[in-house]
Amino acid sequence: MDTGSASIKDYETVLTDIEDSIAVSSEEVLNNQELRLKNTLHEITSSILAINEENKFVNPLRNDESLDVEGKEVFVNPKILSAKIKEFNKLMELLKLTYLEQETLDYFFRFTLSSTKPLQLDSEKDPQFVKLNERVNDLKEEISNVQESKIEQIKAEIQETGHNFAERQDLINELYLEATGDIENCWDSLNELKNLTNKEDKNMMGEKDTILNSSDSDDFVEETYTNWQKLLFLQKQNQRLTKELKEMHEVKNQIIRKGEQSKKEDSGHLMANESELCQSINLLTKFWEKHFLLKGSKTTILNFEIFTQLGKVQFEIKDMQYIIAISLSDLKRPMIKDITILQKAGGNIVTDIEASSKFNNKYRNNTKVQIFEVMDDIISELTNE
């Protein structure tokens, strides 16, 4: 009797500790999630209010009941966010086009027109003006395509990261719910054991005198055997509850380990992705400055084309009669799949097998090299720079 009561009390203490620990951890996770949501909404509201200071197309709601004008509460109506975002996107497209036009004109006047030898243009139909205008349009389209591709890539990465974060958050919430359900099952089992123990104690106390005063030894043996069977049943119940408590400890440790591992993995992935993105942007900037911005009309690259659906880049080398075609194996993690060097010979275009084989052996399926480095190396070797 005393041993059984002590065991039940120990179980209750352990279950209470586990339940409190899970409740505290669950509340902390929910508070962190709510805090992140509030911070996100605050940043969105602050951004919209900042835009509203200089633009009239965003109209945040204000609490007009307050007498203090400067202290009025400002918030954003979520129902109008979709329409306002569309208007904002249209304005951003116009601003982007205007910026590209101004930037193109700036480079055009800076690197094309001479300050000492002004062009003698009769009208807009002048052949020289038409040719320069076409060149400006081509450059503008190339720059726009590259920037849009980068924007779409970054948007896709943001969406993927947000989706993964949401899945991990849902998984943590589900684990806490499952742990809470297991705790409730343990309490039910413990209460059942307590009721059975109390009932057995009452039966044993009520039948004690009858068993001792009975002259029938067979009845005494039968009662003893019955009680022994009940004790075996209670022992099995005790073993089952002990096993469930052990499983609950494992669930708790698993939740803690997954939480710590999730934080480490998220931090590592973010650092790796940011480092790789910065490296790609730096290589693209250097390549663009070297072959387009700094040289201007004297650039060695002509007819630069990007085929996004095919994962292919193609361009020509000025005054060298070379056409270079580079195919990628994967757009998400681009690796060189094939490099083809074509050479113009008379009226025909033939494949330079030796040069193609050389560059393929050097760069094919190389994950450590960026496509801009490959293009720069090919141009340098073919032009002997």
Swiss-Prot record:
Biological-process GO terms, alphabetical: homologous chromosome orientation in meiotic metaphase I; kinetochore assembly; regulation of meiosis I spindle assembly checkpoint
Subcellular localization: Nucleus; Chromosome, Centromere, Kinetochore
Region spans: Contributes to interaction with SPC105: 127-201
Null allele phenotype: Inviable.
Note in the entry: Present with 377 molecules/cell in log phase SD medium.
Family: Belongs to the KRE28 family.
Protein's name in the database: Outer kinetochore KNL1 complex subunit KRE28
Organism: Saccharomyces cerevisiae (strain ATCC 204508 / S288c)
Gene this chain is encoded by: KRE28
